[in-house]
């Protein structure tokens, strides 16, 4: 492996870290932003929804439209757009301009992860491809563990705008790394056409998986979007303590993601998803009652982190399995559309959570989120029964996992 290859992966990983931080840090800043811009918590929560919609549009649509653009040029342009979006957020005079900033960065996010995996595998030997993708996506996990609590801490002490300025600085570093270390000549796979995307969306069994994904994440983010508000307004944690709790949550997420992947490998995606969705619904329901006690809510947040993102490997494995059965010519497209489904779920969950907060109160978000996750569990059981009817086993062997 040449000296330049790990540096190219480092640039991609740093980009993933910056993007992961800007996506999730907003959750810890919602109370601060709402107070500073004089908007309601649900309005601040829409900043999560609109970012996710940007990702959902960016992943399939912009990836198809930019298929002929050289990969390095596109990567640099994406990091430039991402940096500009965060600078707009830093300078945002009001709520409307902050919305524009979130949509811009969301669009960059969607395409970055669509092409990032391709670039990562292009700069290493074929037998190192999976490891290269894993290294790049480590940036997302590290963002949850360190970037989000650190960004929340910065926002609470220096103002929320300072957080976006710090993320913009990371974007500049990632942009320079891409310019310097990512090779200019990279193989280009055939661009996914809109026809291929529509062919995937015409398959009921794939739509079923996308619904599982959207409902599973929608239920999670219905409550998670307002977690910082719950911790401050209901549990009584100080703003500083919320940063520490989010750090603990991020560590738990990292562990849960590994656990979820191993469970899907051992038992197959449907049994793993059934267990994880069931536990997730239970933990969200428990949060409704434990939020009033700081020690109990801390334990509940730990449990929530362990299961909230543990479904990602199983869902991605499963959508690839189903694509190989029904649209083998468009497996990559099917996997990419599942990323869009994740973010549609996030957008709808955050929006619905805002309606719940507005109309019946903050502490109704966990149990309503649990009901949405139970709907995902029901669809998972249905899909598993259809597989058994078709004589399909639940093994996950031989499937490469992409991630959020």
Walk through the language-model features, giving the residues of each:
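Helix-to-loop junctions at the C-terminal end of transmembrane segments
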Residues: 59-71, 256-268, 357
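Paired small-residue
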Residues: 10, 81-88, 96-105, 295-303
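Conserved MFS/SLC helix-loop-helix module at the cytosolic interface between two early adjacent transmembrane helices
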Residues: 57-96
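Cytoplasmic helix-loop-helix junction between adjacent transmembrane helices
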Residues: 95, 101-140
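Helix-breaking motifs and short loop linkers at transmembrane-helix boundaries and internal kinks
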Residues: 38, 70, 91-97, 236, ...
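A late C-terminal transmembrane helix in Major Facilitator Superfamily
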Residues: 322-360
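C-terminal membrane-cytosol helix-exit motif in multi-pass small-molecule transporters
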Residues: 168-188, 380-383
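Intracellular juxtamembrane helix-capping segments at the cytosolic ends
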Residues: 112-124, 310-326
């Amino acid at each position: 492996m040449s000296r330049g290859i790990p540096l190219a992966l480092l640039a991609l990983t740093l980009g993933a870290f910056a993007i992961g931080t800007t996506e999730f840090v907003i959750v810890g800043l919602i109370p601060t932003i709402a107070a500073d811009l004089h908007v309601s918590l649900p309005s601040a929560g829409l900043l999560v929804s609109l970012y996710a919609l940007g990702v959902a549009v960016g992943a399939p649509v912009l990836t198809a439209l930019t298929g002929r653009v050289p990969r390095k040029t596109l990567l640099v342009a994406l990091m430039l757009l991402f940096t500009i979006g965060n600078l707009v957020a830093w300078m945002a005079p009001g709520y409307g301009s902050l919305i524009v900033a979130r949509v811009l960065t969301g669009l960059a996010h969607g395409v970055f992860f669509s092409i990032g995996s391709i670039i990562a595998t292009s700069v290493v030997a074929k037998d190192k491809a999976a490891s290269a993708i894993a290294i790049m996506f480590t940036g997302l996990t590290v963002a949850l563990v360190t970037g989000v609590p650190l960004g929340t801490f910065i926002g609470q002490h220096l103002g929320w705008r300072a957080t976006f300025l710090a993320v913009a600085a990371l974007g500049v570093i990632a942009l320079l790394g891409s310019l310097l270390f990512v090779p200019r000549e990279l193989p280009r796979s055939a661009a996914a056409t809109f026809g291929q995307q529509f062919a995937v969306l015409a398959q009921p069994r794939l739509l079923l998986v996308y619904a599982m994904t959207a409902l599973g994440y929608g239920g999670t983010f219905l409550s998670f979007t307002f977690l910082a508000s719950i911790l401050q307004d209901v549990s009584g944690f100080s703003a500083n303590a919320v940063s520490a709790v989010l750090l603990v949550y991020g560590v738990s997420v990292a562990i849960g993601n590994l656990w979820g992947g191993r469970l899907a490998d051992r038992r197959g995606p449907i049994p793993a998803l059934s267990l994880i969705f069931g536990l997730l619904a239970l933990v969200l329901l428990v949060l409704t009652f434990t939020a009033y006690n700081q020690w109990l809510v801390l334990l509940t947040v730990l449990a929530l982190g362990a299961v909230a993102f543990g479904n990602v490997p199983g869902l991605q494995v499963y959508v690839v399995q189903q694509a190989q059965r029904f649209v083998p010519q468009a497996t990559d497209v099917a996997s990419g559309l599942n990323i869009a489904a994740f973010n549609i779920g996030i957008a709808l969950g955050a929006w619905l959570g805002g309606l719940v907060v507005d109309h019946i109160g903050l502490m109704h978000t966990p149990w309503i989120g649990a009901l949405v996750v139970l709907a995902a569990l029901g669809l998972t059981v249905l899909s598993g029964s259809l597989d058994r009817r078709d004589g399909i086993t639940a093994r996950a062997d031989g499937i490469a996992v992409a991630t959020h």
